């Protein structure tokens, strides 16, 4: 699709807005991924897992909940957790007597990796995203994206 308007055109089509959103989010993710690899030695998917665990109560999550929060398929999550377990960043443990339910638990080493990577990630986000728009625009984006995300989370795909 070829753009026929400027970003200030009030009647941009949903397709044009989607294209801008999609391209920007892909570009920003690539920049964050590159910075994490260069400065921390790991990638954005691993950072996403570390973030979910670092923000969880007791630094642990049930694997199903971790997959939901990171938007990973169970097989992709399992592969990534295996990589991270080898680095000593986390452990996968059975939950009590239920051998079918497993948790991922963040280790001190994993928390340290997260804390240094969070600084790198936030620097890129500030430079390429938050620092480029007004607080009013950021608030509007949050309202729109939160509403859309909430709808998707309720929808079974």
Model-derived regions: residue spans:
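Charged, amphipathic alpha-helical coiled-coil/dimerization segments
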Residues: 3-6, 82-140
């Amino acid at each position: 699709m070829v753009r026929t308007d400027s970003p200030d055109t009030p009647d941009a089509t949903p397709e044009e807005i989607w294209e801008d959103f999609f391209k920007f989010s892909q570009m920003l993710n690539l920049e964050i991924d590159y910075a994490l690899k260069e400065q921390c030695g790991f990638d954005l998917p691993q950072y996403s897992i570390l973030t979910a665990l670092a923000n969880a109560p007791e630094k642990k999550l049930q694997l199903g909940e971790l997959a939901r929060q990171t938007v990973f398929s169970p097989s992709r999550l399992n592969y990534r957790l295996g990589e991270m377990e080898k680095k000593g960043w986390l452990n996968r443990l059975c939950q009590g007597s239920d051998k079918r339910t497993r948790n991922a638990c963040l280790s001190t080493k994993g928390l340290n990796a997260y804390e240094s990577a969070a600084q790198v990630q936030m620097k890129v986000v500030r430079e390429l995203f938050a620092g480029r728009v007004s607080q009013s625009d950021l608030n509007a984006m949050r309202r729109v994206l939160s509403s859309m995300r909430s709808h998707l989370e309720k929808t079974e795909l």
